[in-house]
């Protein structure tokens, strides 16, 4: 990523702030503009109140793409004026220099496909980086369609955040929690058999600490 010969598209979770910060730094080191979507920008904006070191920073290299569905949601919840706070960072398809490789994108597959088509038409072949659990790629054919469009292959660069049972047991034994709430799992019902003080909750339930 040190050269600017090709734009780089990264497939990753928009809510993974650590990954976004890593991309922000990589873009700065390589002299690129980092393009994220509206959801990621608002998330960074809200978290910056708690952690001022997070991007964005004044006069930096961060740009914001407004996907229609996200734009409509923001306007519906907060009004059209909310979008003005990011006006100086706004970028859309008409503002992208498709003859340049100076970009690092973290956007949805739909936006990725549209932008990749623009680069290909300009004779610029994008690079693709996949940074999520591989199961998503196997289940969603949008990833293979992007490969077909660009003639590029997704480069797998990812450290999984998933933990195995023996690792979770070591953590629970070390922490000895008064209450253990299973989250982000397909096997919440099994926790009672392996852990003490488990407390199952459903989506929308309130937990009073």
Question: Can you describe what each PLM-predicted range is?
Answer:
Residues 1-209:
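Acidic/His-rich, metal-assisted hydrolase cores and their charged scaffolds
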